[in-house]
Amino acid sequence: MKKKVISVHKNPNGQIPYMGEFYQLETDTIVNKCLPGLGATTSEILADRDSIIVVPNTPVITGKCKAHKKDNLFGVMAKIMPDDIANYLYDTFAEGKHVKIMTTPESFWKVKQAFQEVGRSMYSCFLMWDECDKLTKDVDYREAITLPLDDFFQFPNKVMVSATPLHPSDPRFENFTWIQMVPEFDYRKDIHIIQTNNVLQCLKDMLSEGQDRPLFIFLNKTDMILALINKLSIQEESAVFCSEKSVDKLKAKGFKSTYVDWNPEKAKKYNFLTSRFFTAVDIILKEKPDVLIVTEPYLSDFTLMDPHTDVIQSIGRFRNGTNLIAHVVTVNEDFPIRTVEGINEYFNGAKMAYETVESLYSATTSEEARRALHDALEQLSFNGMITNGKPDHFKMDNYRDDALVKTAYHDMDLLIAAYESTGSFNLHIETPHLYAYGDYERLKLENASKSIKQKRKQIVEILDTLEIVDDTPLKDEYLEELRTVDRFIVDAYYKVGKKVIEASGYRVKPITEAMILKDYQTQANGIEMVKLLKNSFHIGQRYTLKFVKDELVRLYALLGITPPDHEKITAQTIRKFFKVKDCWIKNKKTGKSDRGFKIIESII
């Protein structure tokens, strides 16, 4: 791909000019604006030609159509159908105006069908694909985003534009020219990097200091957004801008101030935005807001913000500038460190494995063998990088990009290096906000696949860590959260300690017994024997006479007491405490049946 450099200079009044003032979009180019807000989309809307503009999300369309009511701009969204577009085209041609259509990739087919209905060629239009990095970024969960690409290459006049474009590996771009905008002034933004191991608590501490101006928080996880809003008790002061599904989800949970489109009238003191609003949307405010970017990879990979794209784009939404910018981040050392070269080798190996199994599938005549090989093909990683039987370059680019972003979040040194390589920031590395109870520990406790014993062991480890922390309201909050997970083990820790719990194998019965004995040793009140008996014998259960006698002897010995009048302890002694019924219990070792008691009810 050829490269062309365009210098960008400020106007005599010190303002950054709109792109249309110093550069006109050229066909077969990928334009790296470098600076968000250069007005590339607006320039094309106003250009003296027919235009089709592809944008990543509908909030962009809503905002641009509202701003360009007099410019014949027609927005194609979910409810707009080909007939609606056809009627717009008929009116536009009749009035001698320029076609100005803005659509998402998923709705592009409607535009194509509408042109066919009116008997005109859409290829006579100039096609601008805005925020083209989204082709790579989103294709893993928006497969339809690349559907218009085959049509894109048939347009004689076409361009891809972004402030953060990614180099595509698709060979159809080989003859394109990369247009690199180079600002001839310092355009870097100050950003504060705050490492933490407990995002919610860190944000709570930061925001509890008071907020004088509007705050915009970019966080691509609605569950975390709601948790933060509830933790801070800022329900009435918060608004969330997100997708339709997330709006429904939040409203179902009782939070009503949530919207699918940006509207300054809906903004509040605390404004949360998901990835739908990371790019292209114009946020115009009277005062410069504070901006927080939040990343918590332990809770969700979706919160990862790529310094080369997502961070730059998010900050660029504010057309009148920003005040404080901070990135609150947790890193995850479980993410593997990968390189471009290594990932390309992975592709080669994955492709080789796929082609080997595919050749076996083609050569096999057995129906069952073909079924097995087909299932094997479906499971191979390279299968996810194929569309219509051919390697999908954008899916491969997406895999590569995703792996490199995760690499950046392996540790703080790699993240800082990623930020520095953008050339877009002045970094201010703040003192880490580290807590005794972090998101990693919380995640392990919430892991449904862990056994009760594993979770209890984790809680004891956390409690051990908290022991060195001074008593504060925050520590009390942690303890209460742990009690909601397993109150028994928290109470046991503070009554009998870690060693007793470990020696008991984290089992309820011996731990409970130890707790009862502890009470007896410190504040005997005469009911300890009752507690021990109920801990050992349970209503509805069957016990052999031998077990009953041995257990009673053990419990009396634990407390150092004897039955009244030094009565001999036998299995029948159980009748003083429980109503029992004679029964037979099969011995699994001998195959014979032993006499026993079934516990009917307690009489103590």
Q: Which ranges hold each PLM region?
A:
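Conserved Walker A/P-loop ATP-binding site and its immediately adjacent core
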Residues: 36, 40-80, 106, 167-169, ...
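SF2 helicase motor core recognition
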Residues: 36-46, 60-62, 107-121, 162, ...
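The feature captures the C-terminal accessory region of ATP-dependent helicases
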Residues: 44-47, 346-604
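Conserved strand-helix element at the start of the C-terminal RecA-like helicase core
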Residues: 50-64, 102-105, 203-233
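Inter-Walker segment of RecA-like/P-loop motor cores
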Residues: 70-113, 253-262
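SF2 helicase catalytic motif II
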Residues: 105-108, 116-153, 157
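Interdomain hinge/linker at the junction between the two RecA-like core domains of SF2 helicases
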Residues: 163-208
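Conserved SF2 helicase motif VI
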Residues: 298-325
